[in-house]
């Protein structure tokens, strides 16, 4: 079996640098957090913020007096178009 050569390419894939402890030993340390965890965390943050904005908007609308069927339909269509546009740009 061939041994994997230590090249700049393989080192960059591993994202490892060394850090000295107080006793002089070197330990490998990850340079960056796991990118999969980062990508998993980011949508959760943005979706919570978007959800909060939508809830606030609907509460404001519902607090208006005596909404009619027509105003409800108009409001829903405007919100849907805005939401769809944001989804495409993200």
From Swiss-Prot:
Annotated GO biological process: symbiont-mediated perturbation of host apoptosis; symbiont-mediated suppression of host cytoplasmic pattern recognition receptor signaling pathway via inhibition of MAVS activity
Keywords: Apoptosis, Host cytoplasm, Host membrane, Host mitochondrion, Host mitochondrion inner membrane, Host nucleus, Host-virus interaction, Inhibition of host innate immune response by virus, Inhibition of host MAVS by virus, Inhibition of host RLR pathway by virus, Membrane, Modulation of host cell apoptosis by virus, Viral immunoevasion
Pfam families, alphabetized: PB1-F2 (PF11986)
Chain segments carrying region Mitochondrial targeting sequence: 65-87
Region (Disordered): 1-34
Chief localization: host cell
Oligomeric form and interacting partners: Oligomer. Interacts with human SLC25A6/ANT3 and VDAC1. Interacts with host MAVS.
Its job: Plays an important role in promoting lung pathology in both primary viral infection and secondary bacterial infection. Promotes alteration of mitochondrial morphology, dissipation of mitochondrial membrane potential, and cell death. Alternatively, inhibits the production of interferon in the infected cell at the level of host mitochondrial antiviral signaling MAVS. Its level of expression differs greatly depending on which cell type is infected, in a manner that is independent of the levels of expression of other viral proteins. Monocytic cells are more affected than epithelial cells.
UniProt record similarity statement: Belongs to the influenza viruses PB1-F2 family.
Protein name (Swiss-Prot/TrEMBL): Protein PB1-F2
Native organism: Influenza A virus (strain A/Guinea fowl/Hong Kong/38/2002 H5N1 genotype X0)
């Amino acid at each position: 079996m061939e041994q994997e050569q230590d090249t700049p390419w393989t080192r960059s894939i591993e994202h490892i640098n060394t850090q000295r402890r107080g006793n002089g030993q070197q330990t490998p340390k990850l340079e960056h957090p796991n990118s999969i965890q980062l990508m998993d965390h980011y949508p959760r943050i943005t979706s919570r913020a978007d959800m909060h904005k939508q809830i606030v908007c609907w509460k404001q609308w519902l607090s208006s007096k005596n909404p009619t069927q027509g105003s409800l339909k108009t409001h829903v269509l405007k919100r849907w178009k805005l939401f769809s546009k944001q989804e495409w740009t993200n």
